Amino acid sequence: MHYSTISGVSDNEKLELFLVLLLNFYVTISPISKIGLFIERKENGMAETRKLYYENGACLQFCATVLSCVPTDGNFAVTLDATAFYPEGGGQPADRGALGGARVLDVHEKDGVVVHTVTAPLHVGEVVQGDVDGRRRLDHMQQHTGEHIVSGIVHAQFGYDNVGFHIGAQDVTVDFSGPLTDAELADVERAANWVIWQNAPVTIAWPAPSELAQLNYRSKKELTGAIRIVTVANVDVCACCGTHVERCGQVGSIKLTSAQSYKGGTRVTMLCGDRKSTRLNSSHITRSRMPSSA
């Protein structure tokens, strides 16, 4: 029923009556239906989630208001007005942790809205605390910044582009657009660790379109709109949506573990930070027999 079809009252009275009926319908339908209406409005242009992980990559604990909660495959899809949970994207996996006492199993983004898959329902309108798994976040930051260091060096020395990047559970793979010999990769590794020892700063910026047009940056130049630029001082300038450490020293160290020809270029497997220390140190432990006493 449209309010214009109501007879015997003025147009203003028709509109007021229609709004009362609509409000009465909304407050009497089931909570799940309310959520459905809310999500439909959200997907049709409501405000994007405030992304705390962009404001401060070290933010691991926060409070936010629950905007929606929908059952999905035995779990619940939750949206908030703000979040520090990084959603999967740009080759980087999603954060894990806890939200309002529920475990966060996955995080993804759609049309600027970050959706958290959690193990228990949360109440719409409730303010909840989020706790991001700090060890996992730091690991991803180390791997991602390490990749930028290596990719920046390869681009500067050989002119190759990074055409593929993935942080896996065990290894990081980077695909370059040209061939690289073992000797060249050894030089790249040494140069990358030198950058780490120099503790070069890593900065984030959102340049205005006029500034961006003058900026010589690597990767994703086809993107439009607000572009996030990650700069490793004197090494790399790249458009990127991932989380990063503040200084290269926090990467710890880099090891290029293998390389293979791939689609006319080179796929490099690498380890950074704690992954490198744990994996390589554990595989090179030797035991010395204690001398027997006389």
Q: What residue ranges belong to the model's regions?
A:
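Short, positively charged and aromatic/hydrophobic N-terminal segments
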Residues: T5, L23-F38
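Charged/polar low-complexity intrinsically disordered segments
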Residues: E13, P31-K34, E43
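Cationic, low-complexity basic patches in intrinsically disordered or flexible, solvent-exposed regions
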Residues: L15-L17
